[in-house]
């Protein structure tokens, strides 16, 4: 495979390949620029990737604003000890399977017990409905074809089980339990998937102002696997060519200090082929989520 050399961390090999393929297919530079922005890149990042000229920027009719470095946030950061093998979760020690710095990502083993996984699924089952995504225009929620799972949210500390898990997560990630959205349970039957996306709220979208009123920007995501499918359903990170295989009780955590595609946190859920995949997701916010 050809090795790509570049000194710009936001221009990943995947982006370079995509840009070359789309150019060869005959798409205009204006269309490519719009596609990058629609995929989560800030306009200034997209302009940098494409090396837009001043004339092109003016012709596209889009004002290129500087990168929002003032939006960089403090993020959850687990404290690793024992040579990066285990993390203190308060009521249990949790083993680290892998750790990466670009993006900031950790895969945990045994964050949840089998009994906890079963109890979460049993409690969630009667409350499942078609999963919603954030409506970026209004700040509300909508059904989106990119997400074909079923889901529900628990209230914060609504039961001893939920309170225990939330407390463990807070200890593990060094982040207050109040600074996170309610725990979400998702069920993916055969064929269900979630196409690659970013979890942060795009500052360029109209609905973001409303979304930020309830706790500020999202700064990290924790995905916990409650049931592993027989095949398929991996959590993928296309920008870093990583696929995390679901395993019951395990979890993958990743943070993003700014709402920018350069955080390399583009991720998705591959289609489940056989069996079912169940996950619990916790999104962490800058401040108290109400």
Model-derived segments and spans:
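Fe(II)/2-oxoglutarate oxygenase catalytic core
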Residues: 1-28, 33-253, 257-290
């Amino acid at each position: 495979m050809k090795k790509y050399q570049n000194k710009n961390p936001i221009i990943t090999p995947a982006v370079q390949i995509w840009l070359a393929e789309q150019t060869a297919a005959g798409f205009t530079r204006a269309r490519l620029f719009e596609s990058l922005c629609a995929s989560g890149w800030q306009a200034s990042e997209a302009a940098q990737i494409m090396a837009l000229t001043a004339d092109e920027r003016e012709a596209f009719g889009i004002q290129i604003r500087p990168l929002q470095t003032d939006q960089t946030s403090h993020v959850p950061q687990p404290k690793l000890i024992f040579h990066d093998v285990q993390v203190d979760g308060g009521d249990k020690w949790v083993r680290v399977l892998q750790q990466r710095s670009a993006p900031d990502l950790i895969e945990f083993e045994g964050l949840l017990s089998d009994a906890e996984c079963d109890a979460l699924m049993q409690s969630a089952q009667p409350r499942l409905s078609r999963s919603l995504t954030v409506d970026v225009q209004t700040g509300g929620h909508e059904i989106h074809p990119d997400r074909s799972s079923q889901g529900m949210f628990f209230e914060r500390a609504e039961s001893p089980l939920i309170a225990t898990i939330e407390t463990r997560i807070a200890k593990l990630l060094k982040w207050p339990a109040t600074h996170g959205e309610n725990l979400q349970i998702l069920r993916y039957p055969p064929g269900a998937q979630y196409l690659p996306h970013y979890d942060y709220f795009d500052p360029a979208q109209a609905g973001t102002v409303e979304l930020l009123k309830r706790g500020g920007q999202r700064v990290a995501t924790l995905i916990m696997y409650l049931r592993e499918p027989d095949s398929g359903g991996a959590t993928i990170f296309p920008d870093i060519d990583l696929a995390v295989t679901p395993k019951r009780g395990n979890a993958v955590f990743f943070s993003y200090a700014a709402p920018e595609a350069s955080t390399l946190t583009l991720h998705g859920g591959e289609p489940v082929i056989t069996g079912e995949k169940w996950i619990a997701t916790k999104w962490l916010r800058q401040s108290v989520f109400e």
